[in-house]
């Protein structure tokens, strides 16, 4: 795929891409499950056989990002390893094995006049995915849209441009082998930032939904400017509340994993809340464990009182998605205090409680208004793959259509099929 350089060419290029994607969506929406699975099998093989080329392209992207002063968390999101490429190919195979949502009859009923009505899942059409540093999004979005019968236009960040081109070539190879239109998975072949604005315009009806994957500024721009529906979350200010009735060993494991497994992912915990009754027996060992794991802790006066290494938290810390090995910590008055804090400062993404008290857990799960709420489990399970969706195209925190991990099923809509035998309305 040849990249263009002249901005004057861009509207023409993008218009052509959208038109080709729309035409491909018509074919893909009618493709059989077997044909889509054939493409997915070929994509997984292509990713594995081209791993060296993918890693070489990624190494160039990482070198440029490092030279440009990128943070450690950003570099982690950008970097591919042999293991991550293998995981990417494995993810394609997992999507291959999930049920095809297209054509599934979700409801059927008969009216008194004899008509039978069916509610049937259908593709959305053309999905535009705008993402930044994570090259694996290219594969995840491509294969999920394929499985759900949607064409997709991928616009990756300039930092991951080479990596995405290498991955996209593998996806196109799979489409070709399965005799599906190559425009079903399209990568915008330019770094020109104006391409984002054109996608947000909806391309004169060429795009049905937009999914942004990236930092707060990108998502905020998409939500403000998009002229088509958006599946997105603005940020992941996620909390772990450790109740006074928590098991300490479990709390340590959950808190450390929630924050430190991969601090830069959107499911990482950013704030630790601890029941006031557990300041001595629970809070102190949790803070020590976090600091020893290399995490900076910023806390209120109660948290500072248990360890002199804790830095003072500013008001802004409670609303911050660090994306790094930093966590804010606060003592709260029980489950109610935790819920109040999350209501004021949370982003309705993912929040967890650690407790052995089932009534307290039930209250937290019922009252915290987030897309994902967990009991005695890490916030880093906020992932479509962990939900059994095969992969995810993103996590949505809105309340219309899709909420939580957006997998293949969430990338479909529905229509009604009505069967009659000559009925007319009186």
Curated annotation (Swiss-Prot):
<keyword id="KW-0641">Proline biosynthesis</keyword>
<keyword id="KW-0521">NADP</keyword>
<dbReference type="InterPro" id="IPR020593">
    <property type="entry name" value="G-glutamylP_reductase_CS"/>
</dbReference>
<keyword id="KW-0963">Cytoplasm</keyword>
<dbReference type="InterPro" id="IPR012134">
    <property type="entry name" value="Glu-5-SA_DH"/>
</dbReference>
<dbReference type="GO" id="GO:0055129">
    <property type="term" value="P:L-proline biosynthetic process"/>
</dbReference>
<comment type="function">
    <text>Catalyzes the NADPH-dependent reduction of L-glutamate 5-phosphate into L-glutamate 5-semialdehyde and phosphate. The product spontaneously undergoes cyclization to form 1-pyrroline-5-carboxylate.</text>
</comment>
<dbReference type="InterPro" id="IPR000965">
    <property type="entry name" value="GPR_dom"/>
</dbReference>
<dbReference type="GO" id="GO:0005737">
    <property type="term" value="C:cytoplasm"/>
</dbReference>
<dbReference type="GO" id="GO:0004350">
    <property type="term" value="F:glutamate-5-semialdehyde dehydrogenase activity"/>
</dbReference>
<comment type="pathway">
    <text>Amino-acid biosynthesis; L-proline biosynthesis; L-glutamate 5-semialdehyde from L-glutamate: step 2/2.</text>
</comment>
<dbReference type="InterPro" id="IPR015590">
    <property type="entry name" value="Aldehyde_DH_dom"/>
</dbReference>
<comment type="similarity">
    <text>Belongs to the gamma-glutamyl phosphate reductase family.</text>
</comment>
<dbReference type="Pfam" id="PF00171">
    <property type="entry name" value="Aldedh"/>
</dbReference>
<dbReference type="InterPro" id="IPR016163">
    <property type="entry name" value="Ald_DH_C"/>
</dbReference>
<dbReference type="InterPro" id="IPR016162">
    <property type="entry name" value="Ald_DH_N"/>
</dbReference>
<keyword id="KW-0560">Oxidoreductase</keyword>
<dbReference type="GO" id="GO:0050661">
    <property type="term" value="F:NADP binding"/>
</dbReference>
<protein>
    <recommendedName>
        <fullName>Gamma-glutamyl phosphate reductase</fullName>
        <ecNumber>1.2.1.41</ecNumber>
    </recommendedName>
</protein>
<dbReference type="InterPro" id="IPR016161">
    <property type="entry name" value="Ald_DH/histidinol_DH"/>
</dbReference>
<keyword id="KW-0028">Amino-acid biosynthesis</keyword>
